[in-house]
């Protein structure tokens, strides 16, 4: 991937604060459905990492210039397997306290960079 400049996006979301729910969510992410991984890659996303502390999730996305959240939303709306996955994941997730009801992953703003 040398020479390709990737853009980084960081997002946050909460899980329901229940140990069994959190373990189930982690288990699903050990075996993400192949169709979900394909849809992620097809959107221009090159790397995704999700971190967990307590019940707070932090996701880092690295994507090429073909990626946009609007394009991904359209692709997801047209993909029944992604819709099935999202519906299932929402049973484990809850929005951040500072968001409107039903809001899922929230884009975060970078406030510090060591090299800038």
Q: What is the role of each PLM region?
A:
Residues 1-7:
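Polybasic/polar functional segments that serve as interface/processing modules
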Residues 43, 64-104:
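An amphipathic, aromatic/His-enriched active-site/gating alpha helix that lines ligand/cofactor pockets
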Residues 8-14:
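Active-site-flanking beta-strand signature of metal-NTP-handling nucleotidyl enzymes
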Residues 15-17, 65:
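Beta-strand elements of well-folded, non-transmembrane domains
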Residues 106-112:
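Eukaryote-biased recognition of C-terminal alpha-helical segments
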Residues 21-45:
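Short amphipathic alpha-helical segments
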Residues 37-66:
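Short, glycine- and small/hydrophobic-rich beta-strand elements in well-ordered beta-sheets
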Residues 79, 115-116:
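Charge-rich, low-complexity N-terminal segments
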């Amino acid at each position: 991937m040398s020479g390709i400049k990737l853009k980084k996006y960081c997002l946050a979301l909460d899980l329901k604060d229940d140990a069994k729910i959190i373990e189930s969510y982690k288990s699903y992410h050990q075996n993400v459905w192949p169709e979900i991984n394909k849809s992620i890659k097809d959107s221009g996303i090159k790397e995704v990492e999700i971190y967990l502390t307590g019940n707070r999730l932090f996701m880092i996305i690295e994507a090429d210039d073909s990626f946009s959240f609007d394009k991904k939303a359209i692709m997801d709306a047209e993909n029944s397997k992604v819709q099935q996955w999202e519906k299932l994941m929402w049973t484990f997730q809850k929005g951040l306290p500072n968001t409107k009801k039903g809001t899922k992953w929230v884009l975060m703003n970078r406030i510090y960079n060591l090299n800038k």
